[in-house]
Curated annotation (Swiss-Prot):
Name of this chain's protein: Mitochondrial carrier protein MTM1
Residue runs in coiled coils: none
Keyword Coiled coil part of the UniProt annotation: no
Entry GO terms, CC: mitochondrial inner membrane; mitochondrion
Gene3D superfamilies reported in the protein's UniProt record: Mitochondrial carrier domain (1.50.40.10)
Length: 366
């Protein structure tokens, strides 16, 4: 039985269970690369520590407290691009910037583990699991459902996966946007020692979120960065699914050597390799939006300008500013960590999904 026929014969519940099969595994294995990627991407926003003589301004996180402002190496004032954790960082970490600056993916991985504790690499894992399971269920099952009922499925078979993948990602990304925002913020917070408790960070983060909701409203605060997230995720999905469908048809193992390309283990290898290749291509193409998303979500609005008037609301101008002030390489910060995460993540997720579908399909026809 062909893959498409198997997919058509499965119920929506079975597709969703298939999609959830690999979510736990990928989250447990690959969350550390998410933490490393976010830490690398926020580095240009971290001021060089100069506590002595630094000016104090009201802190948006807690009423009545003070936070210090700094000037970066180039002399540009950072008031309009503060990281939300600045006050907590410079109060509790005592400006130990040695634990904040990294020269690459491997150094970031080892420094975070040694300074903050190995468990810091899995910070936010509960949120990751809480998001990954429903998001992947919506995403994968939604993609196949839309693909199968699409009016252009027969007339434009090459374009159909592209459009269906993009539509499925819009629903999936929007459904988990508030949780993704909280997870990104939580994973970005550094600490100077292993004694700093995660619950303290969560408490400060929730307090900061409440303050921002009062400033700009619940919807703008909780869905902050959704637009640029969609600019990252929708093209990613379009590229991924079109590449995956192409790779799956072209890369299957020689059926003359093996009994059938429908054999479970051959099917697994084909799906794994296709997912790995497609994920890497999509990650490279969309990475500048990932950098922009991280910076946008961890930045804190100026108290005197709740509408964010001093920051461009256009994400393309936002990315262009990063390019002009820091160079093109800044838009690819953390690419290695993201590719290291996405390649096996896509491979494990799609192969688990395909194999689970085959299991359900086999039971259906027994």
């Amino acid at each position: 039985m062909s893959d498409r026929n198997t997919s058509n014969s499965l119920t929506l519940k079975e597709r969703m269970l298939s999609a959830g099969a690999g979510s736990v595994l990928t989250s447990l294995i690959l969350t550390p690369m998410d933490v490393v990627r976010i830490r690398l991407q926020q580095q240009q926003m971290i001021p060089d520590c100069s506590c002595d003589g630094a000016a104090e301004v009201p802190n948006a996180v807690s009423s009545g407290s003070k936070m210090k402002t700094f000037t970066n190496v180039g002399g540009q004032n950072l008031n309009n691009a503060k990281i939300f954790w600045e006050s907590a960082c410079f109060q509790e970490l005592h400006c130990k910037n040695s634990s904040l600056k990294f020269n690459g993916t491997l150094e970031a991985f080892t420094k975070i583990a040694s300074v903050e504790g190995i468990t810091s690499l899995w910070r936010g894992i509960s949120l990751t699991l809480l998001m990954a399971i429903p998001a992947n269920m919506v995403y994968f099952s939604g993609y196949e459902y839309i693909r199968d009922v699409s009016p252009i499925a027969s007339t434009y078979p090459t374009l159909n996966p592209l459009f269906c993948g993009a539509i499925a990602r819009v629903f999936a990304a929007t459904s988990i946007a508030p949780l993704e925002l909280v997870k990104t913020k939580l994973q970005s917070i550094p600490r100077s020692s292993k004694s700093t408790k995660t619950w303290m960070m969560v408490k400060d983060l929730l307090n900061e979120t409440r303050q921002e909701m009062k400033m700009v409203g619940p919807s703008r605060a909780l869905f902050k960065g959704l637009e640029i997230t969609l600019w990252r995720d929708v093209p990613f999905s379009a590229i991924y699914w079109s590449s995956y469908e192409l790779c799956k048809e072209r890369l299957w193992l020689d059926s003359t050597r093996f009994a059938s390309k429908d054999a479970n283990w051959v099917h697994f290898i084909n799906s794994f390799a296709s997912g790995c290749i497609s994920g890497m291509i999509a990650a490279i193409c969309t990475h500048p939006f990932d950098v922009g998303k991280t910076r946008w979500q961890i930045s804190m609005m100026n108290n005197s300008d709740p509408k964010g008037g001093n920051r461009s609301r256009n994400m393309f101008k936002f990315l262009e500013t990063i390019w002009r002030t820091e160079g093109l390489a800044a838009l690819y910060t953390g690419l290695a960590a993201r590719v290291i995460k996405i390649r096996p993540s896509c491979a494990i997720m799609i192969s688990s999904y395909e194999i689970s579908k085959k299991v359900f399909g086999n039971k259906l026809h027994q």
